[in-house]
């Protein structure tokens, strides 16, 4: 089921990746360079993010609407403070929903861009992680030809193969470039993930709104996601980072 859903996304991601690589090759970049493949992936990610800008705008508007009704939500919480019976809890929930509907505030709108991105990036990850097996078999994969797969799998950055991982390189002879490159990439990606989300939160939310329960949960995720990515990154190949 999951594979059937991702299959068209994977084909699209592989086609776009190959198209960007061909464009960069036509522009004069070496076809087998790791930098050419890395730039192709970067352009693909930028394209997806650009297409999702309207959703990010909707997310910001939803956050501002939630910010605007925080005083009213706090009044409702004070009104029903200490009331634990089911009728009171239902009444509070209904009043909160009515307030959000009136002001067109949706606490779940912030999740929409993430949910839309997930199939695209899961598909891209499958393309990248499946390249090694396809290269070993000498096969094409989705929209990428066998030659493109071979070029992708054999490409290097700073002498480190794109398919190498931090953990698999520990203690191996000549693994210095892989380890250094992996650490730098993990720090850069974790840091950029943190600062981009932090900037989005502080720009669009007041301190009062940031102290609310929902925003406190988002702040936990703000620190947790880069940490999870950093820990998981040591097991990913360089191109997956």
Regions found by a protein language model. Name each.
Residues 86-98, 102-110, 114-186:
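Non-cytosolic segments of integral membrane proteins
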Residues 1-40, 144-178:
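Interfacial loop/helix-cap signal at membrane boundaries in integral membrane proteins
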Residues 39-51, 184-195, 224-231:
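Lipid-exposed faces of alpha-helical membrane segments in multi-pass integral membrane proteins
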Residues 50-121, 194-228:
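Membrane-interface amphipathic helices and adjacent TM-edge segments
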Residues 32-44, 181, 214-218:
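Membrane-interface starts of transmembrane alpha-helices
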Residues 240-241:
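Conserved small/polar residues in nucleotide/adenosyl-binding loops
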